[in-house]
């Protein structure tokens, strides 16, 4: 049936054209944005996941920047610590040279002073962005943290993980408040010892005796030659501490005798100018620890007390050197870990970007082909609508003469 009121063909052609135009708009939007899922209305699930992961990627980008800053701090501290190791090696070499008879200790001390000033310069200069890990107030250990990663667990809870480094007496060169740093603290060092037979109340027992600053006791083959004495009600000052009890005589000096069960160190002689100690343990025990004459910061071999105890001073420097090497190793390990973490975060960011792309990116080849097809369909729909609109004109021809 042909009607002049209702053009069914034109209505159908127009509906088709509207659908094609709608599809073209969507396709053109995907082509222009490059996204298959650009809004939540396109695909709510994929849009939600992609938006969350983009947010996480922004956080990871901030982590990568923080890692770069942390790496700079660690590398600065590492460079300073590595240089300090070499300087302390030089100081130890100077002290070894000072043990030779006839050397000018004053000249050697001048060289040591320059090396000590270099250590101070290293500790002061090893600062980055206001952070100095080589000198600090370590009254209580201070933890320095470098942002390491941003983590979202299975329940959606996010957290920031850090790489920590503790500043304490084994990791800083100088303590800015006290004397607990590697270079400004005095070390306990292992000292030579000899075994002496000691007669206490009629019972002879062998003791391992470590002597400090007394040549007669630390010399090889030193022996005990004397009698025991039971002193009651008499106080003998020993390094500022008073004792009551048994005493024995060593090289003309009365020293306190310790019961076999006791193992503590005892300072036993102080005449006002020379101070030394005797430690006793059961025979066969390792050498006893004694206090070095000075810290590295306070080395002065022109001082009579230090010059007389160079061996202990060298051992103290050696202990400090071991701590320096350990601290340098720790910083090197952290630097390596930060480098690995930077590489990992970079790869992780790329992987997340790739995953987001798989969810929401448009296939441009496919979209281009679809757009071309829709453009063709649009032209055909317009042609169909044009033909449908000519039907009314055909009806008019029936009434023309």
Swiss-Prot record:
The entry's keywords: Bacterial flagellum, Secreted
The protein's name: Flagellin D
Family label: Belongs to the bacterial flagellin family.
Superkingdom of this protein's organism: Bacteria
Its job: Flagellin is the subunit protein which polymerizes to form the filaments of bacterial flagella.
Family matches, as InterPro entries: Flagellin, Flagellin_C, Flagellin_N
Main location per the UniProt record: secreted
GO cellular component: bacterial-type flagellum; extracellular region
Record gene name: flaD
Single GO MF annotation: structural molecule activity
Keyword Isomerase listed: no
Record bears the keyword Secreted: yes
Record localization: Secreted; Bacterial flagellum
């Amino acid at each position: 049936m042909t009607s002049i009121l209702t053009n069914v063909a034109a209505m159908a052609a127009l509906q088709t054209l509207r659908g094609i135009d709608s599809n073209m708009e969507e396709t053109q939007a995907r082509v222009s944005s490059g996204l298959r899922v650009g809004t939540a209305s396109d695909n709510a699930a994929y849009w939600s996941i992609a938006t969350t992961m983009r947010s996480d990627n922004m956080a990871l980008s901030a982590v990568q920047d923080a890692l770069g800053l942390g790496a700079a701090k660690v590398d600065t501290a590492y460079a300073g610590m590595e240089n300090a190791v070499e300087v302390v090696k030089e100081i130890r070499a100077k002290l070894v040279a000072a043990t030779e008879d006839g050397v000018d200790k004053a000249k050697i001390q001048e060289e040591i002073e320059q090396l000590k000033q270099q250590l101070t310069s290293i500790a002061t200069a090893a600062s980055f962005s206001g952070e100095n890990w080589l000198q600090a107030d370590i009254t209580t250990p201070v933890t320095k943290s470098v942002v390491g990663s941003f983590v979202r667990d299975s329940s959606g809870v996010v957290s920031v993980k850090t790489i920590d480094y503790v500043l304490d007496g084994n990791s800083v060169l100088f303590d800015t408040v006290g004397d607990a740093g590697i270079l400004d603290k005095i070390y306990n060092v292992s000292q030579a010892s000899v075994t002496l037979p000691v007669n206490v109340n009629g019972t002879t027992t062998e003791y391992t005796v470590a002597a400090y600053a007394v040549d007669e006791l630390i010399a090889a083959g030193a022996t005990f030659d004397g009698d025991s004495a039971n002193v009651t009600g008499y106080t003998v000052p020993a390094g500022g501490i008073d004792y009551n009890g048994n005493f024995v005589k060593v090289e003309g000096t009365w020293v306190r005798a310790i019961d076999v069960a006791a193992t503590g160190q005892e300072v036993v002689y102080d005449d006002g100018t020379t101070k030394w100690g005797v430690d006793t343990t059961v025979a066969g025990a390792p050498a006893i620890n004694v206090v070095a004459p000075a810290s590295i910061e306070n080395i002065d071999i022109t001082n009579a007390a230090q010059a007389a105890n160079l061996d202990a001073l060298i051992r103290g420097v050696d202990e400090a050197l071991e701590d320096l090497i350990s601290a340098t190793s720790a910083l090197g390990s952290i630097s390596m870990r930060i480098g690995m973490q930077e590489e990992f975060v970079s790869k992780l960011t790329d992987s997340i970007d790739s995953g987001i792309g798989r969810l929401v990116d448009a296939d441009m080849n496919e979209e281009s082909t679809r757009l071309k097809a829709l453009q063709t369909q649009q032209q055909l729909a317009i042609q169909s609508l044009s033909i449908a609109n000519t039907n009314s004109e055909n009806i008019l021809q029936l009434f023309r003469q």
